[in-house]
């Protein structure tokens, strides 16, 4: 019979990070089990971005810690995963939103995201972001007011923009390279990967005793970690725990921006206003006449966003305009209209996108699953059975949170001291009636 100190179900970015930090904490015989190759499925569908700009103090603290860890790994590795600090730029053309944007930014700044600096055209000490690397870059955020100032630094944006909030401790990286760095460092400390499926967890006397695999092998182990991503709930049932999570399909499109509409040194660009899509009059009339397409003429939510990708002309386009809960599938259904809808939505922020109308570049479309709790906080810690732990429900922030989630999970397993934010992510938070009552009026979850 095989013996391990810990078995981790799921080799996505969270499982790999958990393995890395458990190994660093001194646990040597760690088995990472997944039906699929490491860092595939949802981890391979990431936008690969990160930000510390969160309205939730616990989330902000978690992500700040995760960014600290990622920056340390970048320095150790010669920045093998190409972490940058270009930031997130939230843009609005609605004068009524400016005070709201400033007030919300003041609040996030006070929570620990860094100083908020407000700039006008008359007096601006705004420091543009560097395209590569992250050292010697400002944190906090810069609020640029007025079209002239905004377009001085971002000439590709619409002249209707009246405010642009540049969150600075933010950017993107290669999620695959970060994951492989964590996996390889873990392997050097005793982490082993096995392709297979966890089919059962043996619990005796209220304690985890072992794990059964689809190969028929039983692994004796006192610790079982559920890091199964979109299958978190299914795997939780193996120890008799019904985890309060659901999954949603989120899409992403990549196109060649041959016209250079998006600046190659741009930050992540986010349009913060609701809008109706720009159709020609005859197109709009035809769409409105058909009950199945009428929704394309109605109001779409804020949040369409894009960024340049790689050294060529690729751009990513994302917009969560129609998200529904869905059980995870290997080949999820993809909305073939999504790329054109996202491109048309981006034209509100990037007017030259209209030059692609009617001759859109061939898109690459894919989708991954967000696994979420109701309030969009992760689950990290004990799972209600001695020796069973969970690390997941990281929604759309898996890459940016992975390092801190792995570190926190390892602290729970080894009994190390826990950071102040740990209770906010423990499954036991739902045992508190006051916490459950807050869920009905939670407010901004920070989801982009």
Language model features by range: what are they?
Residues 1-14, 31:
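Beta1/beta-strand and adjacent pyrophosphate-binding region of the FAD-binding site
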Residues 23-44:
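Glycine-rich FAD pyrophosphate-binding loop
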Residues 47-149, 153, 301-304:
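Dinucleotide-binding Rossmann-like beta1-alpha1 core, especially the glycine-rich loop
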Residues 57, 61-64, 91-98, 165-184, ...:
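Short beta-strand to alpha-helix junction loop
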Residues 136-152, 324-325, 336-403, 407-413, ...:
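Flavin (FAD/FMN) cofactor-binding core of flavoprotein oxidoreductases
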Residues 158-160, 164-223, 227, 231:
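Helical element adjacent to the flavin cofactor pocket in flavoenzyme catalytic cores
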Residues 215-287:
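Central helical "cap/lid" subdomain
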Residues 257-386:
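Active-site lid/adjacent beta-loop-alpha segment flanking the redox-cofactor pocket in flavoenzymes
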